Design a protein with these regions (language model features):
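SAM-dependent transferase fold signal centered on methyltransferase-like domains
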Residues: 1-263
Length: 263
């Protein structure tokens, strides 16, 4: 991105610009600092003109807000829409950036989780969003079923659509309710709600079988991670299987997935 704009922005302006952007379907999602607010249209037009599979350019307009983790976006250039179909790992996901939480940055992490699912497993994703884990696992694993839930009605509606879009209806049970209402016995349980995950640890231990595996996402610095692990162990007997760094959130703070087995 910086190379593209070398003739349009000053050296100090280029220094403020991030090197890359997220592409979600046909939408380019940029992070533009306030200092470059007056230059955002130039930046957006450059992206639109130079990336053939980009039809819309937006910028992140807020921090991730509320229990639904939605981060609003502002339209900058191209086709005026925030809805798109995102393709990753052999599946298609329809979504609206202003209505649901979605990040393409976890696509390799989702594959990692898929590769741990065994034949006959019951997999539960109680904060599933539009279904990136649930649909992927239903389509490419030999699990018995996937229980997919999200409290956000918009995310649930897209989840229902994505189950149909990927023809995995027979393998996914979809719900739109509070995760605390569940009492299932899953072999694999995905807890991808990093900001609030610690307040759902009791839900995780209740809904996973003995010897079942939990994928517990959290935000922490490397120094804070041992505290997060102590918090997990304080909620039930378990063994830590792995600690996977899934990208950075801010300087020194990372998204982690702590995989643990309930004992």
């Amino acid at each position: 991105l910086k190379d593209l704009l070398r003739n349009d922005l000053s050296a100090s302006e280029l220094g403020l610009l991030k090197r890359s952007f997220d592409q979600i379907g046909s939408i380019a999602q940029l992070e533009i600092p306030d200092e470059l607010k007056g230059r955002e249209k130039i930046i957006a037009r450059k992206v639109l003109d130079n990336f053939k599979n980009v039809e819309t350019v937006v910028k992140k307009d807020s921090k991730t807000l509320g229990e639904y983790r939605i981060r609003s976006v502002k339209f900058l250039a191209g086709e005026r829409t925030t809805e798109t179909i995102h393709k990753e790992n052999g599946i298609r996901l329809k979504l609206d950036l202003n209505k649901v939480f979605f990040t393409p940055r976890l696509s390799n992490e989702r594959l990692r989780v898929l590769n741990t699912v065994k034949k006959g497993d019951v997999v539960a994703d109680l904060f599933c969003g539009v279904g990136p884990y649930a649909v992927l696992i239903a389509k490419f694993s030999k699990c018995r079923k996937v229980v997919a839930n999200d409290l956000n009605k918009d995310a649930y509606d897209y989840l229902v659509e994505n189950v149909k879009l990927n023809k995995v209806g027979g393998g996914v049970e979809v719900f739109n309710k509070d995760a605390r209402e569940f009492n299932i016995k899953a072999d694999k349980l995905i807890m991808n709600i990093p900001k609030f995950s610690s307040s759902f640890l009791d839900v995780a231990f209740r809904n996973v079988k003995k010897n079942g595996r939990v994928y517990y996402y959290t935000f922490a610095s490397s120094d804070e991670l041992p505290l997060k692990i102590r918090e997990i162990k304080a909620n039930g007997k378990c063994r830590i299987l792995s600690k996977t760094k899934c990208g950075d959130i801010s300087p020194g703070v990372f998204r982690w997935c702590v995989d643990f087995k309930k004992l």
